[in-house]
């Protein structure tokens, strides 16, 4: 059975937080913290649990933030990385975001504390309020962290300044000034950690949604001295542009907006579906010659306000040989933490090199 993300902030995480803080601070009210942390937790969703645990921590850590920060900076020395159920990373989330809630009047100390804590989970969410209220100071830290020896800290330099960070607070200065972000990413484009380079790619993908030509131009600059790592970054960074059929991005990656598919058939195996069921998409076509193709499918799904949003999924990418091709893909209407479904018409659209080849509709009942 799949574990919900919110359940990773439950009894085991609360116990870990209490044990570690009690080891650092012998007068920490271990049992009281556990009892208070559990009170009202069950009905809360993931981010609500984070806020609830921060509020509980505030009852037990010093009201004087420098003293609380001194305790938090010692946490990594006592923090185990794994248990039988998996990693303890999520348990550190409330400890990290505590800094964002209580440390905004102490930006220098808070940023130093976040650097210490980010290897436990990630401080990418906690850093956003500091970028919003203390941009110049925080940006200086990002520039320095991009040169840090710890890959978790270097990743924070990139992930923390993503303009469209999922779940992260929006920072207007990042949305309107891609140049300041790119100055950080320039230091990380040849990083030896895939973990860091993937963050660089995701950051550029964010930027491309508002400044596509800026990202394409930067990609050409980076590929002037091509390496396998840079090529992988650019491929991942331009995935949004490829899905949207951006001609320059497609050409740069070796895909053309002119392609020749014959005898195209795109079908769904049902016209109605219930929640938690699966629909199968089938696509068949004939190629007379080998072609470089990016085949995606888009789901146009209704939201709570009645309007539709679009989510694009990868299907098949690469050089396809001449001949008949039969592709199938299953899509589950199972509710997950990051996606909810509403009854009504859902449209599946097949995209080849960013161009629509057809739409099929299914009714969620």
Mark where each language-model region is:
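Proline/serine/threonine-rich low-complexity linkers at boundaries of modular beta-sandwich domains
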Residues: 248-263
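Short acidic/polar inter-strand loop motif in beta-rich domains
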Residues: 335-337, 351-360
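Short glycine/proline/serine/threonine-rich loop/turn segments at secondary-structure transition edges
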Residues: 335-345
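Short beta-strand and strand-turn-strand segments in soluble, beta-rich domains
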Residues: 261-263, 304-316
């Amino acid at each position: 059975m799949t574990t919900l993300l919110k359940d990773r902030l439950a009894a085991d995480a609360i116990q870990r937080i209490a044990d570690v803080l009690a080891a650092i601070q012998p007068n920490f009210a271990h049992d009281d913290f556990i009892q208070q942390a559990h009170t009202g937790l069950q009905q809360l969703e993931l981010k609500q649990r984070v806020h609830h645990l921060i509020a509980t921590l505030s009852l037990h850590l010093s009201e004087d933030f420098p003293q609380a920060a001194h305790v938090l900076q010692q946490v990594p020395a006592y923090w185990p990385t794994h248990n039988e159920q998996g990693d303890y990373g999520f348990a550190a989330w409330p400890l990290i975001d505590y800094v964002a809630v209580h440390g905004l009047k102490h930006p220098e100390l808070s940023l130093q504390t976040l650097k210490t804590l980010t290897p436990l989970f990630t401080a990418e969410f906690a850093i956003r309020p500091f970028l919003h209220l203390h941009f110049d100071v925080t940006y200086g830290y990002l520039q320095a962290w991009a040169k840090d020896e710890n890959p978790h800290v270097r990743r924070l330099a990139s992930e923390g300044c993503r303009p469209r960070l999922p779940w992260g607070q929006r920072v207007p200065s990042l949305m309107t000034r891609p140049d300041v972000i790119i100055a950080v990413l320039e230091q990380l484009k040849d990083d030896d950690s895939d973990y860091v380079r993937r963050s660089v790619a995701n950051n550029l993908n964010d930027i491309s949604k508002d400044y596509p030509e800026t990202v394409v131009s930067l990609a050409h600059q980076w590929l002037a001295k091509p390496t396998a790592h840079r090529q992988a970054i650019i491929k991942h960074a331009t995935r949004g542009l490829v899905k949207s059929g951006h001609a320059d991005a497609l050409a740069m990656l070796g895909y053309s907006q002119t392609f020749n598919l014959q005898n195209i058939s795109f079908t769904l195996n049902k016209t109605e579906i219930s929640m938690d069921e699966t629909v199968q998409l089938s696509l068949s076509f004939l190629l007379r010659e080998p072609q470089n193709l990016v085949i995606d499918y888009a789901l146009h799904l209704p939201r709570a306000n009645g309007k539709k949003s679009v989510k694009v999924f990868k299907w098949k990418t690469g050089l396809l040989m001449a001949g008949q091709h039969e592709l199938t893909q299953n899509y589950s209407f199972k509710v997950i933490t990051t996606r909810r479904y509403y009854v009504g018409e859902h449209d599946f659209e097949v995209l080849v090199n960013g161009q629509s080849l057809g739409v099929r509709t299914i009714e969620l009942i």
